[in-house]
């Protein structure tokens, strides 16, 4: 069975029993499922070996099998008898006494359903006889982690009508802090399930309460899911409400809270960027991905800064209407430099010609910036950085003048 792919990244040299018993939870990123295609001492075929580990007494073995179910379906889905055996394993795992195994299985149900829909002609039968009963049973699962995972599988109207009111009540539960902690840990999943409008109307106020909770574990959980909440909010709410709230978490006196906030800083910052300009975007599942830059970036620069050939033909009035300069907050003065800085570089008047207007100066700076390649620009900036006062850095001025704050941030991420 050499064609069977292995599911993890690195293969360890020694796998005495071709299993996971000696590796514990640290092998999440290891390639430890070699038991499927490496003949072991038991000389079992791959499918029988799969059953052995799926029904192992070791919880971690069963977790790994549940986590790799999609690949298992790809391997054994062509043979009808093997497929039915795998479906029986899925049913057995769905009834596992260990909540972590059921949670792993629940996360695999949507991709498994998509795969079976594309590859099985009898998908309606498989859906009604196997998958739907599992989903219905998990809706009443006693473990709250599994119920929270179910929210992403329901429609927005259903979640908002049935789950959202109760979830908001539990967020304010003052009897047991463990209840609020579970709500905080799964806040991002609920925001994604109900959508932007309900998030801003009902959940953002509750999120503010949880971020100000006296128990530091609540604030830490909020810092960990901050990116998901930001992703479900509009740009206005993101700037005016979530950004100051995140600053509070970064400055939290508890080291565990501000450490979690710093770990979320990069993903949270990326939610402010324009994907076509910055090259980054968040997928539906909250994962940070790369946006293709080739055409979008060129068009973005062309729209953000006027072309050099047309710079002289554009009037200052039309420029102020199309691209309003952004006033940045004054920076703290540095010893030896003046604290007064201008938003756009002004050209001093001379006897050779009339003085250049502030807007035209901004336009020329932006156009010059677009003509410089990233490599040349980076080298020139670094070589001249120590010789320039703070107010003379062309990077900040050329970013701030042509566009809005989102463009400034996008340029910063790109360069």
Curated annotation (Swiss-Prot):
- Xref: PROSITE patterns: HEAT_REPEAT
Segments spanning the bilayer are none
Q: Does the keyword Repeat apply?
A: yes
Task: Show the ranges annotated as biased composition (Low complexity).
Answer: 301-318
Cite the repeat ranges for HEAT: 86-124, 163-202, 203-241, 242-280
The segment annotated Disordered runs over: 301-362
Keywords associated with the record: Repeat
**Gene3D superfamilies referenced in this protein's UniProt entry, alphabetically:** Leucine-rich Repeat Variant
What PANTHER family does the annotation carry?
SERINE/THREONINE-PROTEIN PHOSPHATASE PP2A 65 KDA REGULATORY SUBUNIT (PTHR10648), WW-BINDING DOMAIN-CONTAINING PROTEIN-RELATED (PTHR10648:SF7)
Q: What does this protein do?
A: May be a regulatory subunit of serine/threonine-protein phosphatase 4.
Q: What is this protein called?
A: Putative serine/threonine-protein phosphatase 4 regulatory subunit 1-like
